[in-house]
Each structure stands twice: as structure tokens, then as C-alpha cells.
Amino acid sequence: MSVGLKVSAFLHPTLALSSRDVSLSSSSSSLYLDRKILRPGSGRRWCKSRRTEPILAVVESSRVPELDSSSEPVQVFDGSTRLYISYTCPFAQRAWIARNYKGLQNKIELVPIDLKNRPAWYKEKVYSANKVPALEHNNRVLGESLDLIKYIDTNFEGPSLTPDGLEKQVVADELLSYTDSFSKAVRSTLNGTDTNAADVAFDYIEQALSKFNEGPFFLGQFSLVDVAYAPFIERFRLILSDVMNVDITSGRPNLALWIQEMNKIEAYTETRQDPQELVERYKRRVQAEARL
């Protein structure tokens, strides 16, 4: 069996790996590429590509260990506001980015959960769905990442992530509704079921990034849409590059600029994983599944 072509479990929130698999070094890690790169579905269209910029991950040196089955229960509904995440889950990363961008680090406590060895009390006392992200606020617990980033933006102070104007609101809704289809398309290429699907999906992203010229982001200015896509584009970029020698930015200048500008936003970069560790964890999972 071919190894390196399955990604669905890697991106599912309930199957995310624990913090033991994530580098917690405060130093940044860089990954430079100098290779022939083939865009998915492009047949014989090869191009020689050399990256001059590093793929960076800024990892918070102050990250606390994830809570596991041996951890004492959190005192739920004691008046605190808590965001339950996993450091390796892209869905949880969305809510984490929103919390950081709003400047709520001192108002929303981050509670990392080890999803491979999760505490029983998390399901029993915190969130019956037993997934992350989950937000404890005003004596109730809310879930679902897209709902949470909207909730955080609406119910807490800080810079707005919601677009102004009806046109941008309509486009935002369309792009947010496409997130699942985007992920499924890229996964189908990685799984080998549709070699052209990722190419089509990233072309859609490239076109979407050209709609508004006020800035490099989906709606011109940084918004909920960027928060929703960033964790997945981050992972797909690294995995496609390493596993399939694919440069998703080749022929896509808007996407290349978007990635460059996203890497200037601290609220995002401080949630990122070490890129080499991310890819290695993916490969280990695929190898394990290939042996089943």
C-alpha cells in the first residue's frame, strides 16, 4: 500500500494528536524548499520553484501542558470564561486565533485537552459532545468552530472580525459555507481519489482572494473568513509540499500574498505548530494506518 496519501483522520478534531507530539520550543522553525514542484491535476506541467521565504511557525513558549485522564477536573461554571482546545486541532485553532486577535488572552482562559488521552470529566462535566473547541461562557458551554468564532467576535470587545456592508457579508457567508467542501476536495487529492480536486479548490481560493482590493485578505481586511481558512491552508500547504512536491502558491499570486500577510499576524502565528513536526506526525499516522 502506498504511504502518505491519507489525511482525513489527521484533520479531524476528535483524532488530533496530543501536545507530546508538538514541539514546545520558543524558537521558530523554518522549512526551505528547493525542488521540482507539480501542481495537482496539472499532468506534465512542471515548474522549477525555489522558495526564498521560510515557512515559519511561532510557538508560544508559555504553552501549558494539555490536560489528560490524570488531570484534576476544571471547576466549571465558577464565573470564568474558558476556551477548550487541542494544540494540534485545526478547528480549535480557529477559535484560538479569534480569541487572540480580539486581545482576550486575559479574559478567556485557554484550556488545552489531550484528545488521545482525554479526561473523562471533560465529557461528563464540560462538553457532552466530547470535542474541541468548546467555549465556557455565562454558565453554558458552546461548540462548533465556525459558530464560536462568530460568537467570540459578537460577544467580546476588541477589533471586529465581521465585515461591513451587505456585499461583504454575503461573500463571507458563501466562503464560510465552502470551508468543508474545500477540505474534502484537498483530502480527495491526498487520498488519490481525485487528483484534480485540490487544484480546483485552490483556484477557487485564488479567485476569492481577488474580489476585494482593499487589502490582501479574503474581504480586503482581516476577517472571520481568514480565521476559518488559515489552519487548513497551513496544514495542506505543508503536507502537499512534502508528500506530493506540490507548491499551492505556484501561479497563484493572491494566495502567495495572503500567506505572506497571514504570517505577519501574531494572533495567528502564535497558534501555529512546528511545520516539520506537523508533517512528521502526518506521516507517522499514515504509516500506522497502512499497517492496519
Curated annotation (Swiss-Prot):
One matching Pfam family: GST_N_3
EC number: 2.5.1.18
SUPFAM superfamilies per UniProt: GST C-terminal domain-like, Thioredoxin-like
Binding site for glutathione: 89-90, 117-118, 131-132, 144-145
Signal peptide as annotated in the record: none
GO MF terms, alphabetically ordered: glutathione transferase activity
Catalytic activity: RX + glutathione = an S-substituted glutathione + a halide anion + H(+)
Domain of life, per lineage: Eukaryota
Span of domain GST C-terminal: 130-286
EC category: transferase
Domain GST N-terminal positions: 79-160
Subcellular location: Plastid, Chloroplast
Family named by the database record: Belongs to the GST superfamily. Lambda family.
PANTHER family: GLUTATHIONE S-TRANSFERASE L1, GLUTATHIONE S-TRANSFERASE L2, CHLOROPLASTIC
Its biological purpose: Catalyzes the glutathione-dependent reduction of S-glutathionylquercetin to quercetin. In vitro, possesses glutathione-dependent thiol transferase activity toward 2-hydroxyethyl disulfide (HED).
UniProt protein name: Glutathione S-transferase L2, chloroplastic
